[in-house]
């Protein structure tokens, strides 16, 4: 089966987060020689398929095995859940159609096209050396993500089945297939700052203390400020105010406080502690409360790593494009792999219609993506 046929089948399952809709049974049927592990909570389902090709004799011996003889373990990772399709599609979003060289359907780009490509590549992979190939799939990436990839990796750690390397099939490309590889992601820190004042009548300014005036005095040091200068892999960390709230809605009452909600997307140079230190210095003599919560940590996979190099070589060979190695964009499940010390990068389809009406992926793109993934498998197994 090729990537197109598999992707068409995957799209036909209406797997809106966290619904799995039986799609894992179909995927398991494609890999009868692979072992499976499944887990999940709160309606989320996760599937892990794995097979050891050409296991070394020492590995076969089980408890009598020598140490350090495990074959390289490579994992393809992705999600089968999709966001709700919304209205005004030209066709049923869960009945894939082919039109003018494109496959239309919810998840075509994000990320059933990528999953279909790596499933097809895995079916056609036949290494001659010891190699452990696995696939990790979740029904909760578009949602909270608490019981998805994160949970499955914790289970794999308990069973000593964590991979050495992984590719997450996120739709990373911007204009042409192969123009972008994510070799890391920025971290994300959410914050709430409350500046306190004294509520009162606007006609008696000496009896009140307006916290909005206080905010105005420090706003240039908070809003849009760069927290570091970045580096070759990361843009400068930046604090962005996303919401302001103050007052009772009356035009003659000054507020007792002003609440500022913000987010900082940050590089390895900035941490929650360094952000707190900076803000406390700015707010030193002002009555306030500050809350910070890190929702994800930044990570980077070396541009010269074996995984990055093999992927880059195969993109250049197959797509005739030199990919840009970058860390742009929001968070993804790749962060959960990195947290376990797993070498991880992200590569997948063009992302011009992700989460949009009439989501689509080109047929040529699926063909090339499958070839890239198969080339990566062959390159790693021959290394």
Swiss-Prot record:
CDD domains: M20_DapE_proteobac (cd03891)
Annotated Zn(2+) 1 binding sites: 79, 110, 170
InterPro entries found in the cross-reference section: ArgE/DapE_CS (IPR001261), Bact_exopeptidase_dim_dom (IPR036264), DapE_proteobac (IPR005941), Peptidase_M20 (IPR002933), Peptidase_M20_dimer (IPR011650), Peptidase_M20A (IPR050072)
A Pfam family per the record: M20_dimer
Keyword Metal-binding attached: yes
Source domain of life: Bacteria
Residues binding Zn(2+) 2: 110, 142, 355
Pathway note: Amino-acid biosynthesis; L-lysine biosynthesis via DAP pathway; LL-2,6-diaminopimelate from (S)-tetrahydrodipicolinate (succinylase route): step 3/3
Enzymatic class: hydrolase
GO biological process, alphabetically ordered: diaminopimelate biosynthetic process; L-arginine biosynthetic process; lysine biosynthetic process via diaminopimelate
Active site: 81, 141
Cofactors: Zn(2+); Co(2+)
Enzyme Commission designation: 3.5.1.18
Function field: Catalyzes the hydrolysis of N-succinyl-L,L-diaminopimelic acid (SDAP), forming succinate and LL-2,6-diaminopimelate (DAP), an intermediate involved in the bacterial biosynthesis of lysine and meso-diaminopimelic acid, an essential component of bacterial cell walls.
Family: Belongs to the peptidase M20A family. DapE subfamily.
Protein name stated in the entry: Succinyl-diaminopimelate desuccinylase
Source organism of this protein record: Helicobacter pylori (strain P12)
């Amino acid at each position: 089966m090729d990537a197109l046929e598999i992707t068409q089948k995957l799209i036909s399952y209406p797997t809106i987060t966290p619904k799995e809709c039986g799609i894992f049974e179909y995927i398991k049927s494609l890999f009868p020689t692979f072992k499976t592990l499944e887990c999940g909570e709160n309606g989320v389902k996760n599937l892990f398929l794995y097979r050891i090709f050409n296991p070394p004799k020492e590995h076969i011996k089980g408890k009598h095995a020598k140490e350090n003889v495990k074959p390289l373990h490579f994992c393809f990772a992705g999600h089968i859940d999709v966001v709700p399709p919304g209205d005004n599609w030209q066709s049923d979003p869960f009945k894939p159609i082919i039109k003018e060289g494109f496959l239309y359907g919810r998840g075509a780009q994000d990320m059933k096209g990528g999953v279909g490509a790596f499933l097809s590549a895995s079916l056609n992979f036949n290494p001659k050396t010891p190699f452990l190939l696995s696939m990790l799939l979740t029904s909760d990436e578009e949602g909270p993500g608490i019981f998805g990839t994160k949970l499955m990796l914790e289970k794999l750690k308990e069973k000593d089945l964590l991979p050495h390397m992984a590719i997450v099939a996120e739709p990373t490309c911007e204009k042409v297939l192969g123009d972008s590889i994510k070799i890391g992601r920025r971290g994300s820190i959410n914050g709430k700052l409350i500046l306190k004042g004294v509520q009162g009548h606007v006609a008696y300014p000496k009896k009140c203390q307006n916290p909005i005036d206080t905010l105005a005095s420090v706003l240039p040091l908070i809003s849009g400020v760069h927290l570091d200068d970045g580096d070759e892999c990361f843009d400068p960390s930046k604090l962005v105010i996303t919401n302001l709230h103050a007052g009772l809605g009356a035009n003659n009452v000054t507020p007792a406080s002003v609440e500022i909600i913000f987010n900082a997307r940050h590089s390895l140079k900035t941490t929650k502690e360094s952000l707190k230190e900076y803000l406390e210095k700015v707010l030193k003599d002002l009555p306030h409360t500050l809350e910070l919560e890190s929702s994800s940590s930044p990570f980077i996979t070396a541009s010269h790593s074996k995984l990055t190099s093999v992927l880059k070589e195969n993109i250049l060979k197959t797509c005739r494009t030199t990919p840009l190695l970058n860390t742009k964009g929001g968070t993804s499940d790749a962060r959960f792999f990195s947290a376990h010390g797993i070498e991880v990068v992200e590569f997948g389809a063009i992302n011009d219609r992700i989460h949009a009406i009439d989501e689509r992926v080109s047929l040529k793109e699926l063909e090339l993506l499958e070839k890239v993934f198969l080339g990566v498998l062959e390159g790693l197994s021959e290394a």
